[in-house]
Regions:
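Intrinsically disordered, low-complexity regulatory regions
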Residues: 1-96
């Protein structure tokens, strides 16, 4: 039986919001194309730098838009997740 974790910073709820945000990006019109720019950049071997650049961009942009700051954080987190995916691909391709 798993012990219930009492998250101090509502991480469980925030992770749910992150997943919902990522799901929404896959439902946008340009995500329905056969290939996305991110796929081609990763296939060309430039994924890590691309993701790190976008993480920096959204971190630096955070707080500068009125009322839309959460979207910058969600994008930053999504690029961090893609970076983790790239690292797993470099190891053995399997996420355990």
């Amino acid at each position: 039986m798993r012990k219930k974790i009492n998250y101090k910073f509502n991480e469980d709820k925030i992770l749910k919001l992150i997943k919902e945000n990522i799901d929404a990006t896959y439902n946008q019109h340009y995500a329905n194309e056969k290939y996305q720019a991110t796929d081609m950049i990763l296939d060309a071997g430039h994924g890590e730098g691309f993701c790190m650049g976008n993480i920096m961009k959204y971190a630096m942009r955070y707080g500068k838009k009125r009322g839309h700051n959460d979207s910058d954080l969600y994008k930053l987190i999504h690029y961090a997740i893609i970076s983790i995916y790239i690292n797993y691909q470099d190891w053995d391709g399997e996420i355990k």
